[in-house]
Amino acid sequence: MGQFLNNKEPYDKYKTVMNGTFFVDKTEILKELIPALQQEQRFFCITRPRRFGKTVMANMIAAFFEKNSEKSLFEKLAIAQYDQYKEQAGCHDVIYIDFSEMPRECHSYEEYIGRIQDGLVRDINEAYPEIAIDKNEAVWDVLSQVFDKTGHKFIFVMDEWDAVFQMSFVTERDRENYLLFLKLLLKGKSYVELAYMTGVLPIAKYSDGSELNMFLEYNMATRVRFSEYFGFTESEVDSLYQCYLEQTKKPQITRENLREWYDGYHTASGERLYNPRSVVCALTDNQLSNYWVSSGKYDSIFTYISHNVDEIQNDLTLMFAGEKIPTWIQEYAATAPELKTKEEIYSAMVVYGLLTYDNGKVFIPNKELLGSYAAMMKKEQSLGYIYRLANISSQMLQATLAKDTETMTKIIQYAHNTEVPILSYNNETELSAIVNLVYLSARDQYRVEREEKAGKGFVDFIFYPVRYDQDCIILELKVDHSPEDAIAQIKEKDYALRFRGKTAEKNKYTGRILAVGISYNKETKEHDCKVEEI
């Protein structure tokens, strides 16, 4: 076992994943890779947002192919039914490189790439002691020497190939040298049996030349092949949820909860995808929560929005209210320092999984990410009216619970008087976008649903308290109608049934049920609010 050659870490890491309660078998991807061995089209680059299982797949592929692996690890998985399973499992020299790893006290590209170069040469020297290897030779020359004398080939599995481009010490010249390193290591080399590479951004973003044009690239937005192997599909989440019900004493999560919180992504063919890490975390914890953990500035929503706040401000307000924004997405998104136009910014956010794209429109994928957007809105002052409204939202909630309609009206009127650009109030969609902002803090204590089926119709907003002894809120909006009309609709349509439960059942919620009506008169440009306990 070496540092890179036939390293046992991928095997051990994949075994750990397999031992988990909520494991999904994705080994059928091997059926698509095995036929490519030693063929001309044997170079694959898979790009996906973070947390979509790229590293798990890379570990699995390395664990399957590398010599000395225990074949028993895969005997109960889908790949074991493949006719070439026994012929291919555990029979190959595998070079596994995680490009996100660095040596201790790394301050330069030379130190970074030197670790990889020296480690590979050392591994090969130990694996082939019968060959006189000059440790000062380039690794591609050493590998060529091994192939010439033994005929042995190597499978390359490379994870996070683009991590180097985000390292602070890497210069533009270093980036060029890195691409040259990969070219000299892989391109046109007979010793390459297969090359499988993963990253967030595609090769074409960084290389407009021919350095790595031997790779076939597969992204989530435009390429169908391999799409089912990254992220969880509907049927896979169905199976995981059934397992959850069988093994959890007091399940707190519904199947619809998983869809609302962690769905929202799509393959190029339109199939729905779930964030795999978040689904597993939620089922393991038996709790819906925001498991989106930022791993750096490129996962930060504001990193992108800050490049053009003025153009994106209104779209952000609408997207937070659940609207979809028409736009054109570039297949190869610009890296953060280059972002200027709205299209470039949205393209980058789609690539990093912060927005999703479907049928020519971008939108916030799910409730998990909605929480990240909400936190940003309350933090970033440069967002202007969004920040101001978000930070008076706690007052709006307290006024609502106290039935203080005078304060409620003042806050809504303040939103109007600050000349929020989106407030043309031509329809209830735009009014609801602002209501989302002025009730932003309510999301800390409530699960806020918009346009949800309740009773005999659809309610504009319904606030489910996290604690069952808290007050419940039903909110209806009206343009050119009175707030009394809104409350009358809440009563007439029996929206309160959402909180009262079925006949003969004990009510889950024990607090008050408050009906809230908010209206806007286009002629007088005035708002009115009413709160009534029902």
Functional labels for PLM-detected ranges:
Residues 1-427, 442-444:
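Phosphate-binding site recognition
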Residues 145-150, 438, 443-468:
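Active-site metal-binding core of divalent-cation-utilizing nuclease and nuclease-like domains
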Residues 155, 471-473, 514:
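Structural motif
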Residues 175-180, 479-497:
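Mg2+/Mn2+-dependent nuclease catalytic core
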Residues 184-188, 347-355, 436-441, 489-513:
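Metal-dependent nuclease catalytic cores in nucleic-acid-processing enzymes
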Residues 435, 459-463, 471-479, 493:
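Conserved catalytic cores of phosphodiester-cleaving nucleases, focusing on short active-site segments
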Residues 502, 508-534:
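Domain-level recognition of nuclease-like catalytic cores that cleave nucleotide substrates
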